[in-house]
Structures are given as structure tokens and as C-alpha cells.
Amino acid sequence: MARKPIPRPRCGSRWTEAQYQSFVKNQLRSATRKWAPISDCLKKARLRRGFYKCAGCPKDAPTSIKVGNKRMKNISVDHIKPIVPVTGWVGWDHYIESMFCEEENLQVLCKVCHDKKSAGEAGQRKIHRRST
């Protein structure tokens, strides 16, 4: 019977495997800000200064909204096909390929629509995990 592999020490044994994966994912998310198809998607959805057309609802969404004393981001560029599928984590190659996709897999959503879509996807993953 094969032994369970022992996790490799990361960052001089200061990080667990989960911390390492979280770090890499965050660095990849940062890199997507410079990905041209994301900028192109935003440009095409722009109606006028500070307003974008939400793909999920008929509203013209402002770039930011004021909540109390804070300004919050109100626009997100969303992947139409989720980065992490319903079945869960597949691997780094799939993750990177999905994250750095072309414009036809991207849409601009207001915060309300993005939160609804994200919650729905998370719910589907949760149901799938319970059934397996």
C-alpha cells in the first residue's frame, strides 16, 4: 500500500501547502489586471465616464457606490465559465488557462449581479461536494 505523500516544506518551512497555494493564486489574480482581454471587455461595456453596461441586468452601473462613509467598487469583470469548475479544483494548468482567457469568456457585471452569480456557483460546488 502506497504511503500518503508528505507535503513539501515551502518558503523555508514557514508556509503550509495551503498558504503556498493561496499565495500563488493571489499573485495570478494580480497578474490578470494587466491581461489585455479584461481591459478590452471593460472598454466595450463603458457607456460614459464612470458608467458601464451590466451584462446581468438592464442597469447602467456606476464604477463605484458610496456605502456609509466608504466608496466601494461596483463593477467586476467576470468569467462567464467559472475558473474553478463545479467539480472543484482540477489543477494549476486548468486554473491558469481559465484565468487568462479570451474576451468571449468575460463579461462586466455590477456588484449585485456578480454576488448573485458567485453565490450560485458556490452553492453548486457545495451540492456537488455533498453528493460525492
Question: Whereabouts are the PLM-identified features?
Answer:
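Cys/His-rich microdomains that often coordinate metals
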Residues: 61-74, 117
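Histidine-centered catalytic micro-motifs used for acid/base chemistry in nuclease
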Residues: 73-91
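Residues that flank catalytic or metal-binding motifs in active/ligand-binding sites
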Residues: 50, 73-76, 106
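Intrinsic structural disorder/low-complexity segments
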Residues: 49, 82, 117-120, 131
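Short, charged surface segments at domain edges that flank catalytic/cofactor-binding sites
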Residues: 2-64, 92-104
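Short intrinsically disordered terminal tails
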Residues: 1, 130-132
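Short Cys/His-centered divalent metal-binding micro-motifs
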Residues: 62, 100-129
